[in-house]
């Protein structure tokens, strides 16, 4: 199977699974401003599950999905671009011919603030961004609304051809748009 180029735009909800369908879906890029849109092309919220490969020796891998032939980790260094204001984000970075050679790398999983982006904030109660912008619901601010754009090339194993492949993002702070090979897959 050809290599898979994965790009994601993360803005500022824990995302369960975004899956590709044959129908073409185009983002409006207004989803994150619309209180009525929680997801586009995302599985319904559900408990965690994982399908081990047939005849996989579950005792040998101790039911650890990361050791399964059906698991591909997205952990590692990704190309990364961070901006302070949402209107500064690159709007065409999902194109397969986009030049990200000037972008830095970022460890995934990773936290922006711990890795030098944004302002480190610890809040055990309340709202982490309190006082940073005018509270004007349902309006979402453009200024001081940090956006991270991620790019990575991965190889899908040849024996996955014809299988349903699900992208699982265990912890996205706010919104995510996902493209694969330059094609929009979903938003959550």
Which functions belong to the PLM regions below?
Residues 1-24:
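Bacterial Sec-dependent N-terminal signal peptides
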Residues 2, 21, 123, 129-131, ...:
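Generic cytosolic/nucleocytoplasmic N-terminal low-complexity/intrinsically disordered segments
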Residues 23-39, 43, 48, 60, ...:
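Accessory beta-strand-rich segments of carbohydrate-active enzymes
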Residues 52-55:
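Activation corresponds to long, low-complexity, non-globular regions
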Residues 71-73, 160:
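Extracellular/periplasmic catalytic domains that process cell-envelope and extracellular macromolecules
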Residues 75-147:
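Core domains of carbohydrate- and sulfate-ester-processing enzymes
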